[in-house]
Structure formats: C-alpha cells, structure tokens
Amino acid sequence: MVALITNLLEQKGKNAPIVIGGCALSYYSREVYFTADIDLAYADREALDAVLKDIGFKKQGKYWVNEGLKMAIEVPSSVLIGEDSPVEIVELAEDLQCKIIGIEDLIIDRLNACKYWKSEIDCEMAELLIRRYTREIDWLYLEKKAVITENNILSELLELKRKAEQ
C-alpha cells in the first residue's frame, strides 16, 4: 500500500512518505513484531490526505481507514529525527518502491521507548535489531544519535552492542 501511495505522490511531483514505527519494526524484525496500522512520516499533509481520499481512505480521528482493505494509516510525524537520517529503499517491482526509516533511527526510537516508557517489548525489539543487524549498523551515526536524544540512551545502546558482539 505504501508503495502505491508513494507512486501516486511522486506522480504529483511530491516526495515519498517514510514508513516508521511498528510497520518499520515489522519489516526489520522479519515479522517477529506485528502491528495493526501503518505509521508514516510525511510533511505535506495536504498532498497525502488527497491521495488517501482518492484511494478510498476516510479520516477517523488520527487515522486514515479503509474498511474494505481493513487497513489504517497514521501520520504521527512530519519529519524524521534529522536531515541526515538514513532511509532504506525497498524495491517491490519496477517503478514501485517505498522508503523505510533507517535501522539506526528505529533502534533509537525503540531505546527511547524502552528507557522513557519502561516498555519491555521495545527493550526486546531494540536488542533483537542490534543482534540481527550489528554488522550493517552505522555505529558512529547511531552512537552520536544516542547521545543527543533527550533521554541520552548511549549507555543502554553500548550494553546491547556489547551483548551482540559476544
């Protein structure tokens, strides 16, 4: 669905939305984690709203819902953490792709939830991602981001890195 939305936005000369949150976690965890909705980061809400309406979604509170598809989309953020935030481009078919938040920023998101909200599932998911992607992670970028978040999660990050390297 996100690839279709991306395609329609790009046809209008707009940028692609970025998959974040639980849907991104489901992708990187290879479906160890499941979510009921799709979270997107996108700045041009007007353009996105128009595309969602065109393909049968209706606004219900903070969600865009398509009853026929049994699908909900939320746009909780207009941007990623920063301009230098990496994204993963997933090619689904020729001229059909979607962008997903980079693994590093997803780990930051999960560690923040782990520390701030005391969310055990987010602690577990951060550890799973670090173990699974330890060789692919840009550790310099990740450690820099861990220090500048409001929760300063560097010590938690380094502990998970140490465990993953054992």
Give the role of each language-model region.
Residues 1-166:
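Compositionally biased terminal segments of proteins
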